[in-house]
């Protein structure tokens, strides 16, 4: 047996991006397969061919009978089983690492673009709530919820390893059956007659065979349970999304069926609206303020012009000669800007009084 540390490091990374059932499956793979194969099982099959004895002296007959009894050694067969079963998980790990790096690069690019725009604008941008993109997983309470392409890869890896598990269980049954026989009768050439061959430590080997078959069955059950868990979770999410009114805030009362709108207080005259790209912006932008200032300025100019015209008209009327009420000669002209007394004289005061001032 070689060193399993290289494969173990990879599977530890897979453990971080797996579901609860997937973590149990990896624990079974580590403890009940790799650890057993690396310690106890290898020692039981170490002297397999050396202690395989046959009651014949025919050259080559013993080797032929051993090949018939064990087409492939159990220990090597189980090593192949572990490699083929864990390969889909390694492929999934490669995809997960790739997606992590891609999302980190996208995040760095977004931050660089935002900093560049801030420097170009010359103003500080307050941190705003951005619209989150659909990622391949979500960390909720320290757990990773798979979704998107990463979820599809994970499901495919489970399907492949389930198929591999079934194939190796069926293959082991077809090659060896369930138990090893103590006596093996060989009838192959060049043996001249049926030869009796004896397997070393058959009971110990049968214990390991049954144990490995049970672990393979447990691994298969966990894979099927994980598929069921993911499928049921996906169906439940689609069912919840298909329900009308899910996610709407409804208040108890007669208007419970209506969606309550957010109404600002009376003195709240500037509402922040959600703009494109998930950023918050004010509806009273600089462009609207500039247009309003221009309109106000034009209105003030029109008013000032009207007032100037009105004042000029009054000065012109006052500068004209006053009309003489009788047919006498016109009196002396009034100086410019002089405003005569236009108070109406009564009939009783038509005669000249001694106290009247002469002009």
Swiss-Prot record:
Keyword set, alphabetical order: Cell junction, Cell membrane, Gap junction, Membrane, Phosphoprotein, Transmembrane, Transmembrane helix
Ranges in a coiled coil: none
Segments on the Extracellular side according to the record's topology features: 41-76, 187-206
Cytoplasmic side: 1-19, 98-165, 228-359
Quaternary structure (record): A connexon is composed of a hexamer of connexins.
Function: One gap junction consists of a cluster of closely packed pairs of transmembrane channels, the connexons, through which materials of low MW diffuse from one cell to a neighboring cell.
Signal peptide segment: none
Protein name as it appears in the record: Gap junction alpha-5 protein
GO BP, one annotated term: cell-cell signaling
Organism: Bos taurus (Bovine)
Lipid bilayer topology: Multi-pass membrane protein
Molecular functions (GO terms): gap junction channel activity involved in atrial cardiac muscle cell-AV node cell electrical coupling
Modified residues (Phosphoserine): 354, 358
Top-level taxon of the source organism: Eukaryota
Cellular component GO terms, alphabetical: connexin complex
Keyword Transmembrane in annotation: yes
Segments of this protein annotated with the region Disordered: 285-305, 317-359
Compartments, record wording: Cell membrane; Cell junction, Gap junction
Gene name of this polypeptide: GJA5
